[in-house]
Amino acid sequence: ARYVLMDSWFTYPATVTKLSGYLPVIGMVKKTEKVLYGFDGQWLNLKAIYRRVRKKPGRAQVLASTVVRLKKGPAAKLVFVRERHTRNWLALLSTATDLEAADVVRIYGKRWDIEVFFKMAKQHLKLTKEIQCRDFDALIAHTSIVFLRYMFLSFECRLSADQRTFGDLF
């Protein structure tokens, strides 16, 4: 893995600081008054930083980005993006400050595929309900079988729906 992708439940300065010593962290950030970031010589919350940062005009996906300092931690890039179908904004944090804002958004978007996979595995492939045991090896075997089911289904879906898999037929 090249990055640690985190949901807003886990993207707090202490966690980010600890993990960033091993891998760069990219995560969604909550709009809370309690978490402060170093910006222009002051410690401000996310909403205050958003008000002060210069936004891009028009309907751009990335509204703004800026580099901030985490308390007792590294520098981080905040990327403000437009929330779909609303006038609201969301904030992403990346400890890889050299990444472009669009790359931060693209990399964080990969997390959504992981969420879809686990929802599918739990709802339709019985990841959590098909087995009840206390043996670690049995749990690993069950999880492996569920993952295999998912791979077979996604492979079949790609064969039947993706035009790129038809080969020389067309």
Report each predicted region and the residues it spans.
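Single, function-defining residue in the core of a domain
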Residues: A1-F170
